[in-house]
Amino acid sequence: MKKISRKEYASMYGPTTGDKVRLGDTDLIAEVEHDYTIYGEELKFGGGKTLREGMSQSNNPSKEELDLIITNALIVDYTGIYKADIGIKDGKIAGIGKGGNKDMQDGVKNNLSVGPATEALAGEGLIVTAGGIDTHIHFISPQQIPTAFASGVTTMIGGGTGPADGTNATTITPGRRNLKFMLRAAEEYSMNIGFLAKGNASNDASLADQIEAGAIGLKIHEDWGTTPSAINHALDVADKYDVQVAIHTDTLNEAGCVEDTMAAIAGRTMHTYHTEGAGGGHAPDIIKVAGEHNILPASTNPTIPFTVNTEAEHMDMLMVCHHLDKSIKEDVQFADSRIRPQTIAAEDTLHDMGIFSITSSDSQAMGRVGEVITRTWQTADKNKKEFGRLKEEKGDNDNFRIKRYLSKYTINPAIAHGISEYVGSVEVGKVADLVLWSPAFFGVKPNMIIKGGFIALSQMGDANASIPTPQPVYYREMFAHHGKAKYDANITFVSQAAYDKGIKEELGLERQVLPVKNCRNITKKDMQFNDTTAHIEVNSETYHVFVDGKEVTSKPANKVSLAQLFSIF
């Protein structure tokens, strides 16, 4: 058999086992752990290549043949970093491994059969990840949705009704009528969407009604009064309906301190938003809850990574988002109590330790909806530069750290909100919501986004050009965005109760409607690569953070990766 160099092989078929790939301009190095494509039997589409009739394509139509095959993709997922063909059928991932013609090639499984009905997409030299999941969305403006989508986010969870003051401050779609309105509005968009209802009520019936109206969970927010009673009632109802509860705790400690909140939670599972505290929560020590076994702790992206500009920009953001007035002394003091460089500095380190499990945006409400993925990788790179390789790494690579940070915006938010059966990873049986990246632009600018197995967004050149590549090249909506195709390619998530009562038919929804499940039987230990529990303390005078008795902190960066260099044009 003829042999070629690794360099030649990588240029033709992409990197193989043992090859290493740098992610963007970071210091993060991914090493290919395994190659499933079988040397000498690789698929390659094009003139004079192998993906042709009678060769790697079967002549015989069959019920197993794929709708689409992505060839020679480098998959970066919590399940591994490996090379494979990805087969897509009926909008789902049908197979991962060696694709082709099982009549002519070894190692081809039925679920990766290429036939006359199969489209091809060349994945050689590209990285494929699952679509991102942002679980902290203020639905203030619909323009957020395409912005997030272009960044690689394919699922948005949160609440709101537009630029009302309640939505500007809280991720809540309150009440049956507002939920109906937003569920219908969601029909328009290329994005999986789920809505959170108002959890601030010491009345089980009002909470239950919202869940039965289609909410996938409850959000408790201090601007509506995060009292121990509201916390207890929301969790009681959530346990009954198997939905998640997200919380923004009481910054002013009016209804109780962090210990009172934990007592009200009483060991039940809770998704805590911006657990560091700059986005809101018990001052100065809400960060303590991140180490508890029943807490699923999240960060929002304004505070990660910690930079020389982080503290300064937060004051104006906070005043606007929470309807505060700089001329009122008490409002300024409220804002000051939330912005603590010491706890922000600790947040980056807690991410690197796997104590913080999720990253999200806090869109237009102290967060940037299009930067969840970028800032997650900037944080990973900042931590590697400051602290070096993780002790868990094996070999000369950063695979463990890469899986840890990828999980924060893919599989872990999916698990937290009961949608991991459908999305959140590159696994057989899951919806084919996939993001394709050039390694040089990883984490910043996707090449292409596949939604429900169909291309929804791509970098595309001049439509009047003779080929697809002439300038200007920029993101353009593809066919999955249009007509009734968008109904097949996207999902509206609802509660099991609403699903069972036929909410799709009741509201005349045309998109796929699927129920959330297994939200209440999870703990921190279910957070992939981010399941560390610890005893966390905050010095009430200095705000320094201690984990199991040892102070944790990080330095503010004056330069980050994946930044202006990638946004020149």
From Swiss-Prot:
<comment type="pathway">
    <text>Nitrogen metabolism; urea degradation; CO(2) and NH(3) from urea (urease route): step 1/1.</text>
</comment>
<keyword id="KW-0479">Metal-binding</keyword>
<feature type="binding site">
    <location>
        <position position="362"/>
    </location>
    <ligand>
        <name>Ni(2+) 1</name>
    </ligand>
</feature>
<keyword id="KW-0378">Hydrolase</keyword>
<feature type="binding site">
    <location>
        <position position="248"/>
    </location>
    <ligand>
        <name>Ni(2+) 2</name>
    </ligand>
</feature>
<dbReference type="Pfam" id="PF00449">
    <property type="entry name" value="Urease_alpha"/>
</dbReference>
<feature type="binding site">
    <location>
        <position position="274"/>
    </location>
    <ligand>
        <name>Ni(2+) 2</name>
    </ligand>
</feature>
<dbReference type="InterPro" id="IPR017950">
    <property type="entry name" value="Urease_AS"/>
</dbReference>
<dbReference type="InterPro" id="IPR006680">
    <property type="entry name" value="Amidohydro-rel"/>
</dbReference>
<dbReference type="InterPro" id="IPR050112">
    <property type="entry name" value="Urease_alpha_subunit"/>
</dbReference>
<dbReference type="InterPro" id="IPR017951">
    <property type="entry name" value="Urease_asu_c"/>
</dbReference>
<feature type="active site" description="Proton donor">
    <location>
        <position position="322"/>
    </location>
</feature>
<feature type="binding site">
    <location>
        <position position="136"/>
    </location>
    <ligand>
        <name>Ni(2+) 1</name>
    </ligand>
</feature>
<dbReference type="Pfam" id="PF01979">
    <property type="entry name" value="Amidohydro_1"/>
</dbReference>
<dbReference type="GO" id="GO:0009039">
    <property type="term" value="F:urease activity"/>
</dbReference>
<feature type="binding site">
    <location>
        <position position="138"/>
    </location>
    <ligand>
        <name>Ni(2+) 1</name>
    </ligand>
</feature>
<dbReference type="GO" id="GO:0005737">
    <property type="term" value="C:cytoplasm"/>
</dbReference>
<feature type="binding site">
    <location>
        <position position="221"/>
    </location>
    <ligand>
        <name>substrate</name>
    </ligand>
</feature>
<keyword id="KW-0963">Cytoplasm</keyword>
<dbReference type="InterPro" id="IPR005848">
    <property type="entry name" value="Urease_asu"/>
</dbReference>
<keyword id="KW-0533">Nickel</keyword>
<protein>
    <recommendedName>
        <fullName>Urease subunit beta</fullName>
        <ecNumber>3.5.1.5</ecNumber>
    </recommendedName>
</protein>
<dbReference type="InterPro" id="IPR029754">
    <property type="entry name" value="Urease_Ni-bd"/>
</dbReference>
<dbReference type="GO" id="GO:0043419">
    <property type="term" value="P:urea catabolic process"/>
</dbReference>
<dbReference type="InterPro" id="IPR032466">
    <property type="entry name" value="Metal_Hydrolase"/>
</dbReference>
<dbReference type="InterPro" id="IPR011059">
    <property type="entry name" value="Metal-dep_hydrolase_composite"/>
</dbReference>
<dbReference type="InterPro" id="IPR011612">
    <property type="entry name" value="Urease_alpha_N_dom"/>
</dbReference>
<feature type="binding site" description="via carbamate group">
    <location>
        <position position="219"/>
    </location>
    <ligand>
        <name>Ni(2+) 2</name>
    </ligand>
</feature>
<feature type="modified residue" description="N6-carboxylysine">
    <location>
        <position position="219"/>
    </location>
</feature>
<comment type="subunit">
    <text>Heterohexamer of 3 UreA (alpha) and 3 UreB (beta) subunits.</text>
</comment>
<dbReference type="GO" id="GO:0016151">
    <property type="term" value="F:nickel cation binding"/>
</dbReference>
<comment type="similarity">
    <text>Belongs to the metallo-dependent hydrolases superfamily. Urease alpha subunit family.</text>
</comment>
<feature type="domain" description="Urease">
    <location>
        <begin position="131"/>
        <end position="569"/>
    </location>
</feature>
<feature type="binding site" description="via carbamate group">
    <location>
        <position position="219"/>
    </location>
    <ligand>
        <name>Ni(2+) 1</name>
    </ligand>
</feature>
